[in-house]
């Protein structure tokens, strides 16, 4: 075994469905300044208020999708890790979570102790956002610096419209699309508009409510516009699959709080599509590479119930890439070239 490790990093999960474990996880997640980007005193107060009721609600949601082996997100990421081993001959393949266990700093320290000297860090997020990619990369760099770990790092960059990634999405989703459907909704995780606006170059006007917000935008703007990258993923996928305009659309889910988030909202689109006569709705969640509470519970359970209550007949959740063989091959190749 050589000294070059591959480290796959995902968001994370509570250790269990207990209210105490969920509260601990939510506190770590929401206190990240890249997630709730407010001054510390305001963030602490807001998170403390959220933690009064949210842990019990979230614990119930986690319990509804929890597997015998544990958290679906962690289990599926470990399956991906196991599949990647034969595609990475340079050293160990490990996983880490930004929040919860296995903790990213601890995994980096363990790799260094094992004699690893180079790490390819792979944040498992196709699109760029401070609250996903930046927080992972910054924590990794901070850990290496503060703990004086003898590690050289290179980072897998966002791959939202990489042709091979789009091909992997197509290979994974094709069997589900071939069963027939009335409409395909590509539901991405949402973000507050201010998370995007603060990254745009000063003086740049960028309409985050436009149908194609990055049309004509500079490369600098496109590199930090999460909404535009999501739209690019969706458009590339629809073109790859030959899905005509009008039979697919994009929305953004998981809104939290009262701030303005990027639109259109998934909960709104579910009602609109049902009322427009869509009976069989397929939903994909391409911001996630592994199924998790946002896909299995928010869309697969609550979203399905909402769609049927609004007049639809059936909502079919298309699984994420998880450990699909084509995704494993594509991810290994992208990491090799990172």
UniProtKB/Swiss-Prot annotation:
<feature type="binding site">
    <location>
        <position position="189"/>
    </location>
    <ligand>
        <name>Fe cation</name>
    </ligand>
</feature>
<dbReference type="GO" id="GO:0046872">
    <property type="term" value="F:metal ion binding"/>
</dbReference>
<keyword id="KW-0627">Porphyrin biosynthesis</keyword>
<comment type="function">
    <text>Catalyzes the ferrous insertion into protoporphyrin IX.</text>
</comment>
<dbReference type="GO" id="GO:0004325">
    <property type="term" value="F:ferrochelatase activity"/>
</dbReference>
<keyword id="KW-0408">Iron</keyword>
<dbReference type="GO" id="GO:0005737">
    <property type="term" value="C:cytoplasm"/>
</dbReference>
<dbReference type="InterPro" id="IPR033659">
    <property type="entry name" value="Ferrochelatase_N"/>
</dbReference>
<keyword id="KW-0350">Heme biosynthesis</keyword>
<dbReference type="Pfam" id="PF00762">
    <property type="entry name" value="Ferrochelatase"/>
</dbReference>
<dbReference type="GO" id="GO:0006783">
    <property type="term" value="P:heme biosynthetic process"/>
</dbReference>
<comment type="pathway">
    <text>Porphyrin-containing compound metabolism; protoheme biosynthesis; protoheme from protoporphyrin-IX: step 1/1.</text>
</comment>
<keyword id="KW-0963">Cytoplasm</keyword>
<keyword id="KW-0479">Metal-binding</keyword>
<dbReference type="InterPro" id="IPR033644">
    <property type="entry name" value="Ferrochelatase_C"/>
</dbReference>
<feature type="binding site">
    <location>
        <position position="294"/>
    </location>
    <ligand>
        <name>Fe cation</name>
    </ligand>
</feature>
<comment type="similarity">
    <text>Belongs to the ferrochelatase family.</text>
</comment>
<keyword id="KW-0456">Lyase</keyword>
<dbReference type="InterPro" id="IPR001015">
    <property type="entry name" value="Ferrochelatase"/>
</dbReference>
<protein>
    <recommendedName>
        <fullName>Ferrochelatase</fullName>
        <ecNumber>4.98.1.1</ecNumber>
    </recommendedName>
</protein>
């Amino acid at each position: 075994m050589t000294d070059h490790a591959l480290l796959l990093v995902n968001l994370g999960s509570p250790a269990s469905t207990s209210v105490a474990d969920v509260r601990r996880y939510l506190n770590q997640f929401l206190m990240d300044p890249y997630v709730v980007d407010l001054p510390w005193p305001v963030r602490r107060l807001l998170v403390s208020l959220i933690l009064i009721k949210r842990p019990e609600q979230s614990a119930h949601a986690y319990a509804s999708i929890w597997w015998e082996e544990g958290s679906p997100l962690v289990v599926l990421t470990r399956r991906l890790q196991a599949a990647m081993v034969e595609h990475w001959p340079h050293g160990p393949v490990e996983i880490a979570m930004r929040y919860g266990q296995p903790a990213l700093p601890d995994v980096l320290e363990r790799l260094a102790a094992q004699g690893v000297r180079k790490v390819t860090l792979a944040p498992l997020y196709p699109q760029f956002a401070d609250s996903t990619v930046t927080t992972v990369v910054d924590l990794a760099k901070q850990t290496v610096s503060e703990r004086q770990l003898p590690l050289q790092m290179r980072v897998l960059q966002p791959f939202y419209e990489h042709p091979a990634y789009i091909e992997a999405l197509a290979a994974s989703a094709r069997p589900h699309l071939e069963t027939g459907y009335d409409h395909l909704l590509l539901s991405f995780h949402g973000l507050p508009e201010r998370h995007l606006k603060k990254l745009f170059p000063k003086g740049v006007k960028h309409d985050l409510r436009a149908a194609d917000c990055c049309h004509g935008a500079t490369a600098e703007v496109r590199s930090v516009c999460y909404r535009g990258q999501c739209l690019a993923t969706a458009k590339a996928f629809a073109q790859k699959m030959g899905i005509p305009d009008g039979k697919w659309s994009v929305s953004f889910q998981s809104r939290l709080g009262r701030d303005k988030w990027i639109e259109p909202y998934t909960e709104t689109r579910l009602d609109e599509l049902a009322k427009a006569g869509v009976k069989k709705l397929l939903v994909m969640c391409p911001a996630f590479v592994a199924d998790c509470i946002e896909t299995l519970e928010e869309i697969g359970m609550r979203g399905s119930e909402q769609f049927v209550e609004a007049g639809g007949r059936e909502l079919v959740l298309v699984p994420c890439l998880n450990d699909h063989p084509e995704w494993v091959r594509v991810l290994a190749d992208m990491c090799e070239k990172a």
